[in-house]
Amino acid sequence: MKHMTRALVGGLGVTVLLVGCGGEDMRGFPTSDGSEEQLIARAASYELDTEYVPPPGEALHHHTAGFAKILCSGVFITGLDADDAAANVGGFISPFDERQYVVDTVIDYEQQMVSLTLPDGVTRTARRYGNQGCVAHPIGQSEVFFTPSEVERDLPPAETTPWPMGDVLPDDAWPAELDMEKVEQALEAGFGPPEARTLGLVVTYNGRILGERYGDGIDIHTPLESWSMTKSLTGTLIGVLIEQGVYDLWEPAPIPEWQGEGDPRQEIRIGDIMRMSSGIRINAPADPDFNEDFYADHYYLYTGTVNSYEYAATRPQQWPPNTIGRYRNTDPVLASYLVRLGVEGAGMDYHSFPQQHLFDRIGVRDGLIETDPYGNFLGQGLAFMPARDWARLGNLYLQDGIWEGERVLPEGYADYASEVAPAWDADGRRIYGGAFFWVNGEGGLGIPDTAYRMLGAGGQSTTIIPTHGLVVVRLGKY
């Protein structure tokens, strides 16, 4: 370990110095060079004759619902100061410059509830519901439309259990060829200065924690917002169901709303959805032809306080599946819907499923996924876990889905996650894989081309580097 690899890790390019150590056939499809002009032209060649209907409601009301949820989660899940959360968290679903329109803020610490009132008299509220996290309510409502569930954990005491199933780290010496001075330099560089707003950084080497850093008030058990890294967690839950025999990766997605006679959405496979290639029509900021005149469905699935699964499942098809790759929240919401359908269809408890069938198996004690008012996991971006728990999840993939000798994910599922999605490849953007992972197919990140990542807004990242046995997790305010 005498050389170092400089790697860009995270959506905002947080620089981390890492210590080095020794599908389908798309032939005949039009391709593009990845330019905006050609992306739009290529998509137009596949366009289906369906209508786009924008989300209902006023943008400011939606933004303020997002703000109430952000404050609730920041204060009652992560333990941030309310002013800190208001100034530094969640600007993409609740723009910071619109938070000034709130004329009254009430934070009820006993009820764990946030209420924000606007000049037109509309009040948006969000409340903590145990393991279902903070949930924003529809206008005029102060409760949710489901019975919150108590989720029990079946794990030994963390303080006496060795890593990775617990918190006790080995005190064995590292191999002599590992330059620990350079490791410390890498950790300092990766954590960055205060303006980087990093809250947690964990690096593991061959499954063992090589080093970690935390911000003020944050420790190894603090649940941190992951934003869209949650998508990869949702893809993992689908993988668990596939390993259990509930689903097959390439079966048509059994979405009830798609089962009408002649519905073309019946051709969409589960594997297409998790490649962000379903072709479902919405308006999303990452689209090359995003229409700013409408409030984005992509955000509405966070802030609409509707049945998010029903909303996503009733959007029409814009392109045939597996032809066009677009980063849209409908796909992870549809995958989350499939999790609920599969879990309940198999007679398992829905809200307990992530803990009992994934988290308990890999040592995760402090994770949760927030829901919409109907109790549906918002698997596109509202999971909270400590940095160490994201490292555990990354190591599950590094180990090809096997944990302590037991297979958790199907054989080859890590390959599916780390391979470039054919539709994205044909679009000239070799950046997205399967199971809602990002890939390094275009190179240029300073890490091996085989590396793949869970990514979330604001530089949230879990980077898996199989060739070097590394997993790097970075979480911070955004």
Annotate the PLM regions.
Residues G207, L224-W250, I273, A335-V339, ...:
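Active-site SXXK
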Residues V364-T371, D415-V471:
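Active-site Gly/Thr loop motif
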Residues L17-G20:
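C-terminal motif of bacterial Sec signal peptides marking the signal peptidase cleavage site
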Residues P162-N206:
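Beta-lactamase-like hydrolase cores
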Residues G235, M276, D331-R340, G381-I402, ...:
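Active-site-proximal alpha-helical segments within enzyme catalytic domains
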Residues G22-D25:
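Bacterial signal peptide processing site
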